[in-house]
């Protein structure tokens, strides 16, 4: 993980039975997320209408042409529901009040991003090693192998940030 920078955006809560202006606010906030690498959809599993909520959000995502964005569904409060069955994949059952659950989220996000991002191997001469810090903010650097003439870095990077690797090539 290192210094990978992420941006989290929160939308208004559930949108069914909301005043029209809040529904449009939800849609516009969600629409701003069209270019994200990973959309995290948090569901209150203890809400008896959670399946309808999921369907509504998925329908809006389809309307906004966002159904191809990789999505991770987090079911919060699933521990409060007997025999809870998730309806979306990939998913994780979480409890926002549990410290273990919060710590596991970072690892879960990194694993999901590794699934989405492309693997790269990069030879960086010592003369360009000062640029590695900038790379750490947009890529997951998995391995750094120091050699006589520089280092070899293996990691993961998004399609839209692949151009950042070009500055290391001669």
PLM ranges: what are they?
Residues 11, 45, 77:
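Walker B catalytic acidic pair
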Residues 1-5, 34-36, 66-69, 87:
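Short loop/turn elements that form and flank the Walker-type P-loop nucleotide-binding site
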Residues 6, 33, 40, 72-75:
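Hydrophobic "anchor" residues on beta-strands that sit immediately upstream
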Residues 22-47, 63:
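Inter-motif core of Ras-like GTPase G domains
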Residues 31, 56-59:
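Alpha-helical scaffolding segments of alpha/beta enzyme cores, especially the outer helices
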Residues 2-26:
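Switch II (G3) loop of P-loop NTPases
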Residues 17-20, 49-54, 82-86:
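Conserved ATPase-coupling elements of RecA-like P-loop NTPase cores
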Residues 48, 59-170:
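C-terminal-of-GTPase-core extension/linker across diverse P-loop GTPases
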């Amino acid at each position: 993980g290192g210094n990978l920078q992420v941006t989290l955006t929160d939308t208004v809560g559930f949108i069914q039975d909301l005043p029209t202006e809040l529904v449009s606010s939800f849609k516009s906030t969600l629409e701003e997320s069209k270019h994200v690498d990973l959309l995290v959809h948090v569901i209150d599993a203890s809400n008896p209408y959670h399946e309808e909520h999921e369907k509504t959000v998925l329908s809006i995502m389809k309307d906004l042409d966002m159904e191809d964005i990789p999505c991770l569904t987090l079911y919060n409060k699933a521990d409060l529901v007997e025999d809870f069955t998730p309806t979306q994949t990939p998913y994780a059952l979480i409890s926002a009040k549990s410290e273990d659950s919060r710590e596991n989220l970072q690892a879960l996000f990194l694993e999901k991003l590794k699934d989405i991002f492309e693997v790269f191997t990069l030879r960086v001469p010592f003369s360009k090693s000062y640029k590695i810090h900038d790379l750490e903010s947009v890529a997951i650097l998995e391995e750094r192998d120091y050699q006589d003439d520089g280092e070899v870095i293996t990691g993961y990077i998004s399609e839209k940030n692949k151009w950042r690797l070009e500055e290391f090539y001669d």
